[in-house]
Design a protein with these regions (language model features):
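Hydrophobic residues within well-ordered alpha-helices
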Residues: 112, 183, 240-246, 286
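Ligand-binding cleft/hinge of the Venus flytrap
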Residues: 79-92, 161, 179-233
């Protein structure tokens, strides 16, 4: 299966889960990029989440992106793009010199408009006059328009992917749930995108309301696990973490991520589809910033060649003629 071929190299990188501590279990996330013989800190959901690559200003290519397509994007950026450069003799891309930041869209917007991010007690400045600043930004159209209004990105983006809406991700300890109606009636502890990700949260709620009605939707959200120790406000980390640690019974998350995590943690998690959810899917687009390096041009060329097949293989919609459509911001 084509999707299986895409997931295979990622799943090889998923290490065994760490032993159970008194209160929580560390979840070993898929690792990307070259191995470095450096001191490393890994907390319960990784100490510095969703920064892949150097943050000292040495990166040849820097991409800030909404994080929910990372299972497709990171292998393309860190493996296939350097291979493409060598094969076409078009560029020289060292994966050790590429930085990809994969955070929720509101966090990406805040980093770029407020000038940085605090990582615990450490502060990483971000800006066109700072060592760290993206060449390219990938996100939905609404956040890209915010960045355009702030003068961060150029005026035209191109659509490269469309999500297929939400799916269900369940702990394998939960039995008797095979569809959305059963999910709504039997899940007593729900984990879902927090208010820090309003776009995804609203999309899931709208899907539930269309499928189940407002009353059943409100009842299900009444069982939401709102917070827990170590929650990041990043659904692609919080949802599987809560399920694996028995902090929740079932979660709502993008369907491609539900399938990815069920394949990554087959002993712990299972995924279910939601027929009809695809009509609530959303576009993801790419745009250059006001400070793009030369390598970004080569990456865009490569990316727009491979994305039409790589994203459907990873559980996204087939875009057809709408792929690459320019959108004014």
């Amino acid at each position: 299966m084509r999707r299986g071929r895409l997931l295979a190299p990622l799943l090889i990188l998923v290490t065994a889960l760490a032993s159970v501590s008194a209160t929580a279990q560390s979840v070993s996330w898929p690792a990307f990029g070259p191995l470095r013989n450096l001191l490393r800190f890994d907390g319960f959901t990784d100490t510095v989440p969703d920064f892949v690559g150097p943050i000292d200003g040495s990166a040849q290519l820097t991409i800030f992106t909404e994080g929910n397509h990372y299972p497709v994007l990171l292998p393309l950026v860190l493996q296939r793009f350097p291979e493409w450069c060598r094969a076409h003799q078009a560029c020289d891309a060292d994966p050790a010199g590429i930085l990809v930041v994969t955070l929720p869209q509101p966090m990406v917007v805040r980093m770029l408009t407020e000038g940085g991010i605090s990582l615990g007690n450490a502060v990483l400045p971000v800006g066109p006059d700072k060592p760290v600043f993206p060449d390219l930004v990938m996100a939905g159209l609404a956040p890209l328009r915010q960045l355009r209004a702030a003068g961060v990105v150029e005026g035209q983006a191109r659509i490269f992917a469309h999500t297929l809406g939400m799916g269900m991700l369940l702990s394998k300890t939960v039995a008797g749930v095979d569809d959305l109606d059963q999910f709504s009636r039997r899940i007593n502890r729900l984990i879902v995108a927090s208010p820090s990700e309003p776009g995804a949260r609203q999309q899931y709620r709208a899907t539930l309301a269309a499928q189940l009605g407002e009353t059943a939707t409100a009842q299900l959200f009444g069982h939401e696990v709102v917070t827990f120790a170590g929650r990041l406000g990043i659904q692609h980390r919080d949802v599987p973490y809560a399920l694996i640690n028995d902090l929740a019974d079932g979660g709502l998350i993008f369907s491609h991520l539900a399938n990815f995590y069920a394949a990554a943690f087959p002993e712990r998690l299972r995924a279910l589809g939601v027929p009809g959810a695809e009509r609530f899917g959303q576009d993801i687009a790419i745009v250059r910033t006001t400070r793009s390096h030369a390598l970004a041009v080569s990456f865009e060329r490569f990316f727009m060649e491979v994305a039409p097949t790589a994203y459907p293989e990873g559980g996204f919609a087939v875009l057809g003629p709408t792929f690459g459509a320019p959108v004014d911001l």
